[in-house]
Amino acid sequence: MTMNMFEQFMSPELLMIPTALLSMLVPVLLIHHNPKLLGNRMTTAIAWLLMTIMSNMTNQLTPSGQKWCQVLTSLLLMILLSNLLGLLPYTFTSTSQLSMNMAMAIPLWMATIITGMTKKPSITLAHMLPEGSPTPLIPFMIIIETISLLMRPLALGVRLTANITAGHLLMTMVSTTTLNFITSHITLSIMTYLLLFLLCILELAVACIQAYVFVLLIILYLQENT
């Protein structure tokens, strides 16, 4: 029976009960914080690294935008852990689902727009018309900028989904090729295994980079509206 490479992206079921929600909540359960307990060196190093990254990403925000730091940090951790846990064998990658990524992108994008319209409506509306636009082109520029604005959450969700899905499909194809070559071509199987090892390292980097890019774009949208 031929294996479908896209079966790994289907929602897992247990006794005909979808367990996708449970897999999405696993990264949240891994984030445990108890101020009464002192962390070890690893947790201290991770906390310091996370604080350094978030401070560098949000240092250009206004004081009102700094209030988003906790939400953005939680979002970064959730996407990062979902991407990394999805690299484990026999696991479900929740960030490979466009529905989940859009469920994260659309509310956050809408929140930045609402924040800008309530606090700086004139500046927010001014983004619809670039400065110095010729008078005859003003209606077309407004339409183009509006479409560009509406495409932002779609770009956020599709970018994350496409990168995670492409990486998993490539790993599936290389690992299947390695398995098929083990009994017939040992040399080729070793070469493809080395390729798979390098690909796993690349996917670890992609998992971290995509979480960083997703949150960074939200911060840039927030910076425009605060």
Swiss-Prot record:
Membrane topology: Multi-pass membrane protein
Superkingdom field: Eukaryota
Chain's gene name: MT-ATP6
Family annotation (InterPro entries): ATP_synth_F0_asu, ATP_synth_F0_asu_AS, ATP_synth_F0_asu_bact/mt, F0_ATP_A_sf
GO cellular-component term (any): proton-transporting ATP synthase complex
One of the GO biological process terms: proton motive force-driven ATP synthesis
Protein's UniProt name: ATP synthase F(0) complex subunit a
Known role: Subunit a, of the mitochondrial membrane ATP synthase complex (F(1)F(0) ATP synthase or Complex V) that produces ATP from ADP in the presence of a proton gradient across the membrane which is generated by electron transport complexes of the respiratory chain. ATP synthase complex consist of a soluble F(1) head domain - the catalytic core - and a membrane F(1) domain - the membrane proton channel. These two domains are linked by a central stalk rotating inside the F(1) region and a stationary peripheral stalk.
Protein localization: Mitochondrion inner membrane
